[in-house]
Amino acid sequence: HVLQAVGDPPAFLAEALRLLAPGGVFYTLVEDYQGLVVDASTEAGRRLFLDVEPVIRPTGTHLHHGRQAFRELRAVGFEDVRVHPIVVDTTNTSRATFARMLRFWRDGYVDFLAEHLGETPAAMKARFDDQIAAVEDPERYAGWWLLAVSGRKPA
């Protein structure tokens, strides 16, 4: 699962298609952070990944790439392209594991995101902490709708 971090996903997919044997299947997990739904207590916490997407984009990472993968696989020549939704949420996943993921992101990105959004590191950390608190609260829901996409090389 790397397409959101590849500078030129169509070129990557075209190369994957070229390398596959006829009839071979390409399968990947694609991320789309708009599918990350957290019942955070503040508007800033709820908007976190919507606000940071334009900041991350110039680094070559596309946080909303998941929705484009179907089209891109078809455009480079894959056949029988399918989307397999995967929901990871607080009803089927450990809240502690989900919160740990957000803590890793917070600890790795707070300073960068704060600088590029014109916020203080404390304000950016508070956005992540709001999401983490919601994930850990058994009365709140959080989930991530991920997409696994597959396509077959023509025979």
Where are these regions (language model features)?
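A short SAM/SAH-binding and catalytic strip from SAM-dependent methyltransferases
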Residues: H1-P10
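Short conserved AdoMet
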Residues: G7, A21, F78
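A short glycine-rich, Lys/Arg-flanked "PGG" loop and its adjoining helix->strand segment in the class I
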Residues: P10-V25
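Conserved catalytic/acceptor-binding region of the Class I
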Residues: Y27-R95
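Amphipathic alpha-helical interaction segments
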Residues: Q68-E72, A126, L146
